[in-house]
Amino acid sequence: LFVEDYFRDHMLPFVQPVLLVKDKIRPFLNNAQLYLSILLQDKDAPDSPSEYALVKIPSDHLPRFIQLPSPNGEYHMIILDDIVRHSVSWMFPGYEILDTFSLKLTRDAELYIDDEFSGDLISKIKHSLAKRHVGPASRFVYDAEMPVDFLEFLKEVFNLERFDTLKEGRYHNNFDFFQFPDFGLSHLKNPELPPLAYAPLEKTKDFFGAVSERDHLIHVPYQSYESTVRFFEEAASDPDVTHIKIVQYRVAKKSRIMQALLKAIASGKQVSVFIEVKARFDEEANLRWGEKLEKAGVTVHYSFPGVKVHSKLALVRRLENNKEAKLYSYLATGNFHEDTAKVYGDFGLFTADERIVNEVARVFSYLETVKIPEAPFEHLLVGQFNLRENLEKKIDFEIQQAKAGKEAWMILKMNSLQDPRMIKKLYQASQAGVKFKMIIRGICCLVPGKKGWSENIHAISIVDRYLEHARVFVFHHGGEDQMYLSSADWMTRNLSYRVETAFPIYDENIKVEIMESLQLQLGDNVKARILDESLSNTYYQSGNDLAIRSQIETYYSAKRQSDEQINN
């Protein structure tokens, strides 16, 4: 009775039942929307061919999981799909329901711009965005139990090719499990790990003085993002700050950072924002922010043709010591996004080191003028200039060291490794005797551990409660242990078609801190999976009786550091 009442009272306006008739009735399938396909038979014509119908599962309007009336102390749930299944006979009176199968169509969301190099790129992006929701089919996911003739009928009705289809289970859109209620049962939840204060920047009364004194590193989500937000809020309110510059790729809907920029422009400072309007799925939000900032008087620079800007950079100019200009920079592996900073594992560096800040200023000059800087980059590795070339040189140096019988190794952490040229170089290094340890969360097109080919490469992937998003490259380099944090994965799109930035870590204490984090991950024997030739992704077993779950250990290591800072 509850299910019937719920369907009638809440779902009925949204289900849109329709009989499918080849070449006559072809409903439009919304992108990523869940549907129930129905096999039915006319009760008045039992010998006639079966018919087909389609009903929308309204998960875009209602919760995917519905709590049923239950005795005290018990919790019973039903998934929205099954309420629709239960109700289809009511929607098709006069028909016998033979079976039901779930399906979902994903449409191509790529923005196809014929020519980025002529005309108004922003107008072209806006025009392309308007057509995104009606893009061509790219993937048709269906219930594995669906009969072949039913599938063939649907392929014909919706003009699907064989390679568009993907057989899956009875329920789709597993992302919806993020909505699953917790019923207040704390013992079933992960223990809370509240972000930790980074006291040297959050508690200081002289923010820029603290950064001027030494470099500072935050590691989110273990440490609070408050230091990053404060960087902009302090700059906005500090009367000695004259300029603020930032690259915006993705930002939070309610962004304190953007609000700080608006406050800065209102107080008479010069604010310059480079907005990457080709940030996938954030194009509309970025355009809206651009319009808002421009109306407030901010100088806004937008994407330029052929290249995507993925660097995570900010720059502040401040007058100090008899009105002498001093630069401060924040460089990060992740976006200026307060929300993702709660779940993405990223590093952010605050620095006034002239070797770095002067080159950050050159990156901004390039973004604002599209003129190649006269002076080369000697410290930053910047996509479109020296990123790929310098990474290859550093690998070549390790190869030379190994061939000379000297110690040679690298530790590489990134989201994805796909670039064929870099993979070939890594194979060459392995064959020369260079030792590798790699942490690759996502795509890994390199095959580690293959005898005679890549046996010196050990690779793992860690998927846990936080998304591993930081990119870290460490090269032994004859004992120098050169370390870079970066916005770039080793994918062709990052190394060849984006403005990315890899920045060196010069502070020895920060190097130690990052290396300790990497070693915890490399020793993980709870959530780490081995990437190897067999592609089995088996969990790593270290033979150590002590369970090491790197994200939890990283948090408590950061907590010890935070407690010491606060007590001192």
Stretch-by-stretch model annotation:
Residues 422:
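Polyanion-binding catalytic cores of nucleic-acid enzymes and NTP/SAM-utilizing transferases
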Residues 1-410, 428-432, 444-468, 472-568:
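N-terminal localization/anchoring segments of enzymes in phospholipid and broader phosphate metabolism
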